[in-house]
Amino acid sequence: MKVIFTQDVKGKGKKGEVKEVPVGYANNFLLKKNYAVEATPGNLKQLELQKKRAKQERQQEIEDAKALKETLSNIEVEVSAKTGEGGKLFGSVSTKQIAEALKAQHDIKIDKRKMDLPNGIHSLGYTNVPVKLDKEVEGTIRVHTVEQ
């Protein structure tokens, strides 16, 4: 019997996959527990529509990330920090501070965990901070650290 998996079933199939399985296994386990539906022409057409919709949504996410990348390349975030002698900062500027400044100054919300700044910013001036906007799209934020 051909079935369309509605959930991942370990060792048998992944969600959205169409597979031939024994009739007893399909009727007594997969269909009964709603792990799969029978592969009728109507269900197959519905599966194709779902795949097409998911592909369009993914494409839209990538386009949105690219638009955000373009926006980020044209702006500058100013972060003030306490400094000591010689322009050295007390502590460092963290990704949390950058995310808060970006939200306050430009009304753009980016998760601090998406910024790649392992040690923080330790000096005054300009720093380019890489940001992972999507699996495929990476941008940079220009951060200007000034004396408080």
UniProtKB/Swiss-Prot annotation:
Gene3D superfamilies: Ribosomal protein L9, C-terminal domain (3.10.430.100), Ribosomal protein L9, N-terminal domain (3.40.5.10). One of its GO terms (molecular function) is structural constituent of ribosome. GO terms for biological process: translation. The keyword Acetylation does not apply. It comes from the Bacteria. One of its GO terms (cellular component) is ribosome. Keywords: Ribonucleoprotein, Ribosomal protein, RNA-binding, rRNA-binding. The keyword rRNA-binding applies. Binds to the 23S rRNA. Belongs to the bacterial ribosomal protein bL9 family. This is Large ribosomal subunit protein bL9.
